[in-house]
Design a protein with these regions (language model features):
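Alpha-helical scaffold segments that mediate packing/assembly in large oligomeric complexes
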Residues: 1-63
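Sequence/fold signature of self-assembling virion shell proteins
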Residues: 35-62, 74-77, 83-186
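Short, conserved, surface-exposed binding loops centered on an aromatic residue
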Residues: 65-72
Length: 186
């Protein structure tokens, strides 16, 4: 039974990242990541770099509510496929960076080293197969809505029911869990 409980948790994780990775349409009929309406995606795909991270963080911090008012969200998580964590550590933990003129310059992202949580998620690599793997910056879910997992009756653990049947040795198990993955906001 414990293996089934772990499998259910892995399936929830898979569904969350699948929704993000496949850029599903959300409640407004637009894709979750949409340059025109949501303004939450870079123009071209790239691996994490100081410039790309700064651009994505600015897009996040410039988000507005449906009435056009600034909502002042701060970046909290950097969600990366396996392998980009090394690059992220270099981006956030280096006080200085090399410039094209071969000099040292202050790394503006160094100040965020204690505020941004790096999340390396292998599910992104699996979903991408051999294709390029996207990465994401998100706000604190306590500050704004994001991807949410809701559970039937708030029960976050699988329900186990054991039964016996006359004439059979051993037990029969019913193991079930109900959840839904949804997007509250972009």
């Amino acid at each position: 039974p414990a293996k089934y409980a772990k499998a259910a948790k892995r399936e929830i994780n898979h569904q969350v990242y699948e929704l993000i990775f496949k850029n599903s349409k959300i409640f407004d009929g637009k894709a979750l990541f949409d340059a025109d309406t949501h303004k939450n995606v870079l123009a071209t795909g790239c691996e994490p770099s100081i410039e790309a991270v700064q651009a994505l963080m600015l897009l996040l911090m410039q988000q507005t509510d449906p009435f056009g008012n600034a909502i002042n969200v701060k970046p909290k998580n950097m969600i990366l496929p396996l392998g980009y964590g090394f690059k992220a550590a270099q981006i956030f933990q280096s006080q200085t960076v090399n410039t094209p003129e071969n000099t040292q310059a202050f790394n503006a992202l160094y100040q965020y080293r204690n505020n941004i949580q790096i999340i390396e998620e292998g599910e992104l690599n699996v979903l991408a197969g051999g294709a390029p793997v996207p990465w994401f910056v998100s706000a604190d879910p306590k500050q704004v809505g994001s991807v949410k997992v809701d559970y039937l009756n708030g029960n976050k653990r699988p329900i186990f029911r054991r039964s016996e049947k006359t004439g059979y040795l051993g037990f029969f198990w019913d193991i079930y869990m109900d959840w839904v993955v949804s997007v509250k906001d972009w």
